[in-house]
């Protein structure tokens, strides 16, 4: 077992926060909802104020989802590249919200676009974290056919994060959709293999396998719960821990 796998959330010092693009659109159904972006930025600030180093990956599904484009006849690689560009837009929006709160932030893109984001250079990104800057990794892995969940797991490993925090609309991993089934059971702990075998939908299989192979815990929690992110890192809160 790796050192990070044996730690509890209350002892983490560097984490990856993964959120979906849909989390930024509020109730409007599409695009960016500035008050929602600002609320999430405030949650990130509350953790940053604890001295914890923060990486972020944000999906792009509120603007464009590559798989949907592919299903409608678009070439998959082209659709995925469009989805990557959507993640850059979301990253810039989050950067603006964080810097409005006086949090130094860097957007780091896997696809070069030097006028708006830094290129991904691992050692430079680590140095940003050491200087307590929030690093938002955009454009996925830079390659089609990989999800932003896989990108978050990859970057979390490269940055030596102690866990991935997957912010969702529910407070953990359930055996079935709790919004549809009142008798749904929430797991406090679940293994990577159980997630894969039971199709629990935490992340895609590639991301789960990459986390499993590197003993990287995944903490699934509700991003809609005020103070939830900070609470878990302070040693309390409701969540599911995915581990080996």
UniProtKB/Swiss-Prot annotation:
One GO biological-process annotation of the entry reads:
'de novo' CTP biosynthetic process
Which EC numbers characterise this protein's activity in its record?
A: 2.7.4.22
* Listed CDD domains: AAK_UMPK-PyrH-Ec (cd04254)
Source species, please? Answer: Paracoccus denitrificans (strain Pd 1222)
Q: Which reaction does it catalyse?
A: UMP + ATP = UDP + ADP
Documented activity regulation: Allosterically activated by GTP. Inhibited by UTP.
Per the UniProt entry, the signal peptide is none
Which GO CC annotations does the UniProt entry carry? cytoplasm
Function recorded in the entry: Catalyzes the reversible phosphorylation of UMP to UDP.
Q: What is this protein called?
A: Uridylate kinase
The residues that hold UMP are: 60, 80, 141-148
The segments labelled Involved in allosteric activation by GTP in the record are: 26-31
HAMAP family annotated for this entry?
A: PyrH_B (MF_01220_B)
The annotated pathway is: Pyrimidine metabolism; CTP biosynthesis via de novo pathway; UDP from UMP (UMPK route): step 1/1
Q: Does the keyword Kinase apply?
A: yes
Specify where it is mainly localized.
cytoplasm
Could you tell me the keywords of this UniProt record? Answer: Allosteric enzyme, ATP-binding, Cytoplasm, Kinase, Nucleotide-binding, Pyrimidine biosynthesis, Transferase
Where does the record place it?
Cytoplasm
| Subunit note | Homohexamer.
InterPro entries xref list: AceGlu_kinase-like_sf, Asp/Glu/Uridylate_kinase, Uridylate_kinase, Uridylate_kinase_bac
């Amino acid at each position: 077992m790796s050192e990070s796998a044996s730690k509890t959330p209350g002892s983490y010092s560097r984490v990856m926060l993964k959120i979906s693009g849909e989390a930024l659109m509020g109730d409007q159904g599409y695009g960016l909802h500035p008050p929602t972006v600002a609320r999430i930025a405030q949650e990130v600030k509350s953790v940053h104020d604890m001295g914890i180093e923060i990486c972020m990956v944000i999906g792009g599904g509120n603007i464009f989802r590559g798989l949907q484009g592919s299903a409608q006849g678009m070439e998959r690689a082209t659709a995925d590249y469009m989805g990557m560009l959507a993640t850059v837009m979301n990253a810039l929006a989050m950067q603006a919200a964080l810097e409005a709160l006086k949090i130094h932030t860097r957007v780091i893109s896997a696809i070069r676009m030097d006028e708006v984001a830094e290129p991904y250079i691992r050692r430079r990104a680590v140095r940003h974290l050491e200087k307590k800057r929030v690093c938002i990794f955009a454009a996925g892995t830079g390659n089609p056919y990989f999800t932003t969940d896989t990108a978050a797991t990859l970057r979390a490993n490269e940055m030596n994060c102690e866990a991935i925090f997957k912010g969702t609309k529910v407070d953990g991993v359930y055996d079935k959709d709790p919004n549809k089934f009142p008798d749904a059971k929430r797991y406090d702990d679940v293994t990577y293999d159980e997630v894969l075998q039971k199709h629990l939908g935490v992340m895609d299989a590639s991301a789960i396998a990459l986390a499993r192979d590197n003993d990287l815990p995944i903490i699934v929690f509700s991003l809609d719960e005020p103070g939830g992110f900070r609470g878990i890192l302070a040693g309390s809160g409701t969540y599911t821990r995915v581990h080996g």
